[in-house]
A protein has these predicted regions:
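N-terminal helix-loop segment corresponding to the beta1-alpha1 unit
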Residues: 5-155
């Protein structure tokens, strides 16, 4: 499975794509999962949001996780670390690909807008009003993609 995003040269420099995909095209389940063909953008951090998108990925959805530059998701350092990444992070971010983007910056906002253009679902778990302040509220994203489903998890 490949992520196909067209970036302008400045956006390409701002975004770093990495792969955390454990399902290969040679897998016996590739292409026959219940959520095959569903694209999920995961801009959540900590546990609740990433765990919900983990389950979507487990059922075949293509999940793209957006992490902040420098530190990534806070869970990266939890538990026993190997090569600077904790087991909990690897567990809840399996079957995902990762993009680095600063959601507080205009370039980061543009990256998310481009990702949701052809996405089916976006998962987030920020405090009420945070995404709206950054220009990424449902009202803005649904203008880009009217069929977008936004999953908001707090706790």
């Amino acid at each position: 499975m490949r992520v196909s995003i067209r970036f302008t040269p400045s956006l390409a420099k701002a975004a770093k794509m990495t792969q955390h995909d454990t399902d290969s095209e040679d897998s016996p389940t590739a292409g026959i999962m219940p959520l095959s063909g569903v694209k999920v953008v995961d801009i959540a951090n900590f546990l609740a949001g990433p765990m919900s998108s983990m389950f979507l990925g487990d059922f075949g959805a293509e999940v793209i996780k957006v992490e902040r530059p420098g530190t990534g998701d806070e869970v990266r350092k939890w538990g026993n670390n190997k090569d600077g990444v904790g087991l909990m992070y690897k567990l809840i971010n399996r079957n995902k690909r990762s993009v680095t983007a600063d959601l507080k910056s205009p370039i980061g906002v543009e990256i998310v807008k481009r990702l949701v253009k052809d996405a089916d679902v976006i998962v987030e778990n920020y405090r009420k009003g945070t995404l709206e302040k950054w220009g990424l509220g449902y009202d803005v994203l649904s203008e880009i993609n009217p069929g977008l489903v936004m999953v908001r998890i707090t706790g």
